[in-house]
Amino acid sequence: MKILVTGAAGFIGSHLCEELLKDKKHNVIGIDDFIGPTPFSLKLKNLKNLLPEKRFTFIKENLLTADLASLLEGVDVIFHLAAIPGVRSSWGNHFHPYAAHNIQALQRLLEACREHSIQTFVFASTSSVYGEKQGKVSENTSLSPLSPYGVTKLTGEKLCHVYKQSFGIPIVILRFFTVYGPRQRPDMAFHRLIKQHLQQKPLTIFGDGQQSRDFTYISDCVKGITAVLGKPHLIGETVNIGGAERASVLKVVSLIEDISGRKATLHFSDKIAGEPSNTWADISKAKQLLHYDPATSLKDGLTNEIAYLSSLYQGE
């Protein structure tokens, strides 16, 4: 099976490529243009295990300008993870790249799929499409994104649906809930807090720290993504990919202190515009359709991320 992963040098994309290559029948093409909040050096490090693989081909190109007809030649499955991520930086003058890469690039890819016989097109969406909600959210919950980023991802979902309805593009939408673990982006909360703690700096808490998230460990997330393979009955479905545990930011800080054996100093700052107070995934559908069973505890997952970042920032 020939599989295309967009955003292959990213946090989730690089882990996904590695998991796909465990199956000797898979040949993986990864495309990435090294844009977004993650530095070039870290994205290159993400690819370290992949580049020597004979069944992996890496292409450094932008989906807005790439020759998609050539790229999609013989491709069976597409995992479209490439996007400009993050709520904070999607406001104001920073919005243009979000619109270009999260909407226009997706539309180009969907349009190109009209000329190719793709088995499955998996679109990576986000819990940000739900907005401010109380309690668990199922896939049928009303969608009210709070940020320009969330709006671009919801627009992406709508594009996927119209291309399925009009041209039969076999889309599956997965909504990720706060994925964490080794290789997590530097702008994400866990990475930022752990780095500050390792460097013995005050930990910046946006808001009062009581906001909570459904945290999904990277290996659990990737298992959910790859479970889509070989399931044609999933075409047209939207599925939440959540974690084994949810917690407040202050609870996460407490776990970081426990794991590191050192107390943290906290610096409280203004709440981020566009961030919901809570997220909580109802993963009943994922369990039913994907046999999805996230098993990594928050403490175990944080321990792994701390070990990774300790190695990454050693000597700084």
From Swiss-Prot:
Enzyme class name: lyase
InterPro entries noted in UniProt: Epimerase_deHydtase (IPR001509), NAD(P)-bd_dom_sf (IPR036291)
Pfam families linked: Epimerase (PF01370)
EC number: 4.-.-.-
Keywords linked to the UniProt accession: Lyase
Lyase recorded as keyword: yes
Active site per the UniProt annotation: 149 (proton acceptor)
UniProt GO molecular function: lyase activity
UniProt cross-references to Gene3D superfamilies, sorted A to Z: NAD(P)-binding Rossmann-like Domain (3.40.50.720)
Annotated binding of substrate, by residue: 126
Superkingdom to which the source organism belongs: Bacteria
SUPFAM superfamilies per UniProt: NAD(P)-binding Rossmann-fold domains (SSF51735)
Keyword Lyase: yes
Annotated family: Belongs to the NAD(P)-dependent epimerase/dehydratase family.
Name of the protein in question: Uncharacterized UDP-glucose epimerase YtcB
